Each structure stands twice: as C-alpha cells, then as structure tokens.
Amino acid sequence: MKHSSLLLSGALLAMTQSSAAQDNKTAAVAATAGPDVPVSMCIGCHSIPGYQASFPSVYRVPKIGGQSQQYIEAALKAYRQGARNHPSMTAVARGLTDQQISAVAAYYEARGNSPVVAVSK
Amino acid sequence: MSGGIKTKFAWAAGVALVVAVPAAAQDAKKGEALAQQQCAACHGKDFLTPIDATYPKLAGQYQDYLEKSLRDYKTGARKNAIMNGIAKPLTRGDIRDVSSYLAALPGPLSNEKR
C-alpha cells in the first residue's frame, strides 16, 4: 500500500516535471513584452487602475493581471470569432494569432497581485 | 403619555438607525448568500479557484465590470449557456449585491502596470 502510493507520487512528480519543462517557453515569453507578446495594444486600458471604457457604455475595464491564462485565451478567441462583442476588443483580437493570444494571456496571468492582498472595490 | 420631546426624538432616531444600518448589512448578506449559492460551485468557494481554468476568477474584480457582465448575460448580449441561465432570474438589486460582495474580496486580480 505504502509502496504503491510512493510509486504513484513518483509518477505524478515525473509528469509534473515534464509539463513544467514544456511550460518553460511560455513562462519565458510571459516575462517581457515584444513582437511575440504584443501587449502594447492592451496596456492603454488594462494597465491603468480604475480606467473606464466610455464606449459603448461606461464601466471600468476589467482587471486581467492575475486572471488565468486559459480564461484570457478563451475571452480573446470569443471576441475574435464574434461570440463576444465589444468594438475595441473585437478589433484587437482579430489582429492576433493563436500564438500571440497564448503569449498575451500568459503575460497577464503573471501580472497579478502577489501575495494576494485585499482590494478595494 | 410620559414621552416628552426628548423621548420622541430618541425614539425617532432609534427607528432611523434600525432602518438604515440593517439595509446595507442586509444587502451585503444577500450578496454573500447569492454568491455562495449561485457562483461558488463553478468559480470556487474563494471565487479564485474555478472548476475549469477557462472560467474567470471573480474575487476582487471591479464591481461595475461584474455588473455589466451579469446584465449582458441576463439580456443575452453576452452568450454562455451556463451564465445566461444563472443571470436570467437575477434582479438589478441581486446583480448589484453579488457584484459588490465579490469586488470587495481579496484576490490577485490587478490592472497595475508591472
């Protein structure tokens, strides 16, 4: 019993390590903005705390730093294919490749509050 | 009967307090209850650990963005089979209460330039 659970945890560890190795490239890319990580289109709204979108309606643009990479990817792809509508986001997303979407999403996932702090509304 | 002006004033002030304070407290309680009942199962008990990574973290998100999202899900302007169903029965007050509760929670979400 003990032995098999040890084996299992060994196998799990090996799996974790190999997927970590695969993620290395994404992690490295996430560190810096550039042609592969075209966040220059994002920062004008999403890197200004409290920034309000004024069209089509007035509300603060969502915080995306610290959001999960997979959610940001899903959101950008939904805008790109028209499943989700917002004039500027649709325009931005239509200009991005799958690879750029992944890179931008990883970039923002890595830019949350750390450690987690209480936030004001 | 024995009540002078002073007593009447104190009585009125007491009524005002009883009415005003619990209204806000009740809204917060309602928001918390709604969030636990309607959101936690998928978005996580802390609203940061969703059961599916493509679902967003909600804790600490801006209140007005959460409200807009829920309104858009309610009207169908934003489409998601699950969220459209969840948002449909919510009133404007429900949407405000739940968004206010979620926005005040601690979390990693940030729009700081880093």
What name fits each language-model region?
Chain B
Residues 11, 49-51, 79:
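N-terminal alpha-helical segment
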Residues 27, 35, 62, 69, ...:
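Stable alpha-helical elements in mature extracytoplasmic
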Residues 20-22:
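N-terminal signal peptide c-region/cleavage motif recognized by signal peptidases
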Residues 32, 44-75, 84-88:
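Gly/Gly-Pro-rich "capping" loops immediately C-terminal to redox-active cysteine motifs
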Residues 26-47, 61, 111-114:
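Sequence/structural segment immediately N-terminal to covalent heme-attachment motifs in c-type
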Residues 1-12:
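Bacterial N-terminal signal peptides that target proteins for export
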Residues 75-78, 86-113:
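C-terminal capping alpha-helices of c-type cytochrome domains
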